[in-house]
Structures are given as C-alpha cells and as structure tokens.
C-alpha cells in the first residue's frame, strides 16, 4: 500500500501537556521498525466492533462488485484511529491510499492534482475535512457523485467549463466536528460512522500489542494502570507507554517486566493522575470551582481565563471530562459535577 502524505497548513493551538493531547501527532515513523504500530487489517484493529462490522461488510460487497468502496466519513474525538482506519480500508481493498489534510488544500489546483492522479478504486483520505474551503468542496461534489471533475478554463467572456472523467475512487473524510460540515458535502458520503472512546479491555489489549512491538514487558497491573490513564484514547495509550518505557530504562535497573510502581512514577512525572486527567484538566475544573462557584461559565470566558483556544477546549478537553461525568454543558455554560469535586478533593 503506497501512502502519499501532505500535511501543510496551520493547526489550532495545542495544550501545553502534549503528552495527553490526542491531537498531538502520533510518534509513528515508518522508517523505524519499532514505530510501525498501526494495524494493517481489520482483524488486527482492536476495538470499535460495530464500526468494523459495518465497514467490513461494505468492503466485501465492493470487492464482490469489483467497484470502489463507497465514500466514508469518520468522525469523533481525536486519537481514536480515524487515520489508521483509512489505511486499513485501503489495505483491505488492495489499493493505494493518498493522505492529505483540508488545510493543505488551499488552492483549486491542490485538490485537482490529487484527483487526476488517482488510479481506479484508490482511496483519498482528507483529515480535518470540516476545514475544506468552499472552492475545494465544490470541486468535490461532482467528483464524489458523478466521478467527474468540472474545471473552468479562461476568464470572463472566454471562460468555459471542461469536464474530466475520474476513475472510481473512495473519499474517506475524518473530522472531530461533524456538525461543521456543510449539508451538501455530508450528504455525499454513503457511510457516516462515529468512533467512540475505548473501553478498559480494548485499551489493555492495545497496550499489550504495542508493548510487544516496541520490545517491553508489562505486569498485568502496569498494563491496567496505563490503560486506565489514557483518556480512552489509543494514541495517548501508546504515548504513555513510551514515557513509561523511558522511566523504566533509567530508573528500573534494567531487565524484568515493568511494574505498576514504575508506571506510577512516569504518570507522576508528567502530572497525569490515575483517571487520565492532566494539569490542564484539573486547572479547568478548579478554576470553575474557585472562581465561578462551579459554573455555569461560557466557553469563551473559560478559554480566556485559561489562556487556551475555545475550539481546543470544546473538541479536545471537554469530551473526555464529560464522558467521565466531571463536566456538564448546559445552555448557560459549563458546570462541574459533584464527581469532579470529589476527584479533586481526593487528588489534593
């Protein structure tokens, strides 16, 4: 499977605690064997069982017809495996996967160049697809629906439209903000699937698999502790495991399985607690309690007080805190829960 990657363009500001930031780019570097952590096939992809069932049937049906897979939109919090799933789909279909991101497609020729170079049944993956420009979207409409590219040649009275036929292809879009997609674009995806946060069992399996790939051994308690502290996110689980490995190599005396004490030391070093909250999470909750009586507080006010970006708070920080029952969104703003107060008191 060939992968062409294009990733230019600005990204939203990141939180200081990059270790626990699911938007932070994964550390896989394909030139280093130990970093080949991505699963290659659906059978190797841990978790997201309903998603795998739906996409597995779609892949088998497309292969049976000898046609391209229908266009796929994957959405959900960052770090849950949307890019990995796109690559897995290409592998299952036996085609090339071209990878780019919406901010990199600033000019019409950027997306035209990708589309005209697609081979039959190839897969084009666009990350952050909600950030596509209007011009790029309009070029995609006929490409997705009619496998046709409409180009305007010339200007003014001499302008004319030229149509180019495209081979059957699959567009896989990924987004953390499905509601920000325009209806015409969203409606052209035949498969729209959400990725959910991972459960403890699946995360332990991911940690165990990654540990084997990078050559470390964990006690069951250590594996469980890492899985419980990674915010339900495989990308963070793999990153935490690397930091635990660092501590073990320096403090562990060499040899033997990594135990829970070493995991605890690594988490403490990076200010991550046993539920996966980092210093920024605790600061947000504490600010709501200390300065606003627990809320409600508007998103913009909260972001300004924290010196953070509202979009990052809404798409990266809040989903996990709400999933953990520590934060509520109300029509009047954000509020902490009794569970958040108890957790902060316990951690104090």
Swiss-Prot record:
The gene is ruvB. It comes from Synechococcus sp. (strain CC9605). NCBIfam families: PRK00080.1 (NF000868), ruvB (TIGR00635). DNA binds at residues 329, 334. HAMAP family: DNA_HJ_migration_RuvB. Homohexamer. Forms an RuvA(8)-RuvB(12)-Holliday junction (HJ) complex. HJ DNA is sandwiched between 2 RuvA tetramers; dsDNA enters through RuvA and exits via RuvB. An RuvB hexamer assembles on each DNA strand where it exits the tetramer. Each RuvB hexamer is contacted by two RuvA subunits (via domain III) on 2 adjacent RuvB subunits; this complex drives branch migration. In the full resolvosome a probable DNA-RuvA(4)-RuvB(12)-RuvC(2) complex forms which resolves the HJ. It catalyses: ATP + H2O = ADP + phosphate + H(+). Mg(2+) binds at residue 83. This is Holliday junction branch migration complex subunit RuvB. Keywords: ATP-binding, Cytoplasm, DNA damage, DNA recombination, DNA repair, DNA-binding, Hydrolase, Nucleotide-binding. CDD domains: AAA.
């Amino acid at each position: 499977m060939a992968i062409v990657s294009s990733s230019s363009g600005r990204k939203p500001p990141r939180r200081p605690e990059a270790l626990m930031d699911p938007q932070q780019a994964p550390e896989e570097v394909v030139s280093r064997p130990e970093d080949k952590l991505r699963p290659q096939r659906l059978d190797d992809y841990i978790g997201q069982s309903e998603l795998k069932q739906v996409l597995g049937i779609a892949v088998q049906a497309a292969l049976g017809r000898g046609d391209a897979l229908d266009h796929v939109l994957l959405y959900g919090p960052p770090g849950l495996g949307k890019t990995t799933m796109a690559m897995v789909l290409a592998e299952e279909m036996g085609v090339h996967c071209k990878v780019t991101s919406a901010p990199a497609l600033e000019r019409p020729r950027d997306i035209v160049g990708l589309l005209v170079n697609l081979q039959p049944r190839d897969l084009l993956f666009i990350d952050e697809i909600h950030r596509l420009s209007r011009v790029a979207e309009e070029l995609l409409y006929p490409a997705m629906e009619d496998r046709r590219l409409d180009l305007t040649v010339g200007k003014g009275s001499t302008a004319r439209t030229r149509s180019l036929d495209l081979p059957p292809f699959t567009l896989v879009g990924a987004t953390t903000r499905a509601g920000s997609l325009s209806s015409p674009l969203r409606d052209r995806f035949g498969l729209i699937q959400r990725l959910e946060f991972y459960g403890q069992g699946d995360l332990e399996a991911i940690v165990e698999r990654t540990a084997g790939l990078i050559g470390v051994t964990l006690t069951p308690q250590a594996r469980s502790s890492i899985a419980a502290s990674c915010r339900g996110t495989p990308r963070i689980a793999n990153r935490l495991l690397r930091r635990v490995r660092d501590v073990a190599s320096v403090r562990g005396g060499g040899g033997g399985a990594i135990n829970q004490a070493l995991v605890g030391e690594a988490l403490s070093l990076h200010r991550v607690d046993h539920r996966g909250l980092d210093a920024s999470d605790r600061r947000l909750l504490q600010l709501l309690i200390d300065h606003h009586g627990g809320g409600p507080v508007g998103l913009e006010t909260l972001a300004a007080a924290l010196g953070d970006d509202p979009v990052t708070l809404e798409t990266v920080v809040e989903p996990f805190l709400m999933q953990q029952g520590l934060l509520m969104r109300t029509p009047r703003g954000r509020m902490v829960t009794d569970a958040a107060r108890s957790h902060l008191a316990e951690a104090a």
